[in-house]
Regions:
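Terminal amphipathic alpha-helical/low-complexity segments used for targeting or macromolecular assembly
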Residues: 1-106
Length: 109
């Protein structure tokens, strides 16, 4: 999902009460599951089996369940429940986008 504006690492970490690690200048422009992630996206990982593929993906901000070395050019947010944090953000951003839409759409002919 594309976001209606860029969100900073700090903003995202505060929204989910997580600990930010890495490049504080990184911003998110989208949020997606790892199999469809794009550069600028937020992704999550909550199982050691998937740490390497997620940390080496093009995702810019990764929500993870334990502290680890942050790859260059990325940021991590440590959270005890990455899946729940990711779902919260998805719903939060969806509401933000819906609020940007006009309540009275006009169809032009």
């Amino acid at each position: 999902m594309k976001l209606h504006r860029d969100y900073t690492l700090t903003e995202i970490a505060q929204l989910i009460s997580g600990d930010a690690i890495g490049d504080a200048g990184i911003s998110a422009t989208g949020i997606n599951e790892i199999h469809v992630v794009n550069e600028g996206d937020i992704a999550f990982v909550d199982h050691p089996k998937y740490y390497k593929p997620t940390l080496t993906s093009v995702a810019s901000i990764i929500i993870i369940d334990q502290k680890t070395d942050c790859p260059k050019g990325k940021a991590l947010i440590v959270h005890p429940e990455p899946f729940n944090a990711f779902n919260f953000l998805t719903q939060y951003f969806k509401k933000e986008i819906e609020q940007q839409l006009s309540p009275d759409p006009v169809i032009h002919s």
